[in-house]
Structure formats: C-alpha cells, structure tokens
Amino acid sequence: MKRKEADNWIMSYDKNNIFAKILRGEIPCKKIYEDEFVLAFYDVNPQKKIHALVIPKGEYVNLDDFASKASEKEIAGLIKGIGIVAKKLEVSEVVKGGGYRSLVNVGKNGGQEVVHLHFHIFGGEKVGKMVS
C-alpha cells in the first residue's frame, strides 16, 4: 500500500498477492468455474456453509479500480460469472437455491485484505444481517 494523505490509504496492485499466484497456477485452488474473464473457487477459510470467491483475471486492486479501468466486456464477464457461479453452487433463486449474498470489500475501511478485486459468494444457509 502507499500513503496518499494522513490516514487515507490507497492500495496499489501487488503482482505477488495470493490471487495473482492462484491465477498463475503457483498456488492451487478448488476451482468452481473459469472463463476468459473470471476464475471462481472455494474460499479456504469459509465463513458460511457455501463460501466462494469470484475474481477477475485482470490486475484490478478493487471495485473502484475495476470500474474505472476495465473494458465493457470484462465488466459484463464478471457480472455474468457471478451469476454462473451462483447457479453452479445451487444457491441462485433461478435453481431454487434459496438465495445468496454477493459481497465485495473495498479499501482499508471496507475490510479489504487482498489487493485483487474479489467477490465473495455466501449461501447454503441464511447469511444474516448485512452489517453488525
């Protein structure tokens, strides 16, 4: 991370972050889905009965970075990928899975821990309130 102003941090992309290593095949993952735009896999430390991650294949720090730099195809591919993964996990209401939560953390105050955009997919049980 680099410092912009006092108490205001801006993250910069780290090519050695864990998701970059997974994308390069240096670290294994339990893959759920992959196409030209996204990779989806199970979280190694699940917070719910079903907990998956969907990441873009491009080098994007967070949702702000993605929204300002990604192509329309990448944006559509990510959104479509999240829907495909929800269906594959059988949590989507389309497959009568009862629903799911898609969550993305942005920046320090948003709780982002890895400097590669990633969406969490939680399901398989009631996920509770949005924020405690």
Task: Go through each PLM region and give its residues.
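HIT superfamily nucleotide-processing domains
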Residues: 1-132
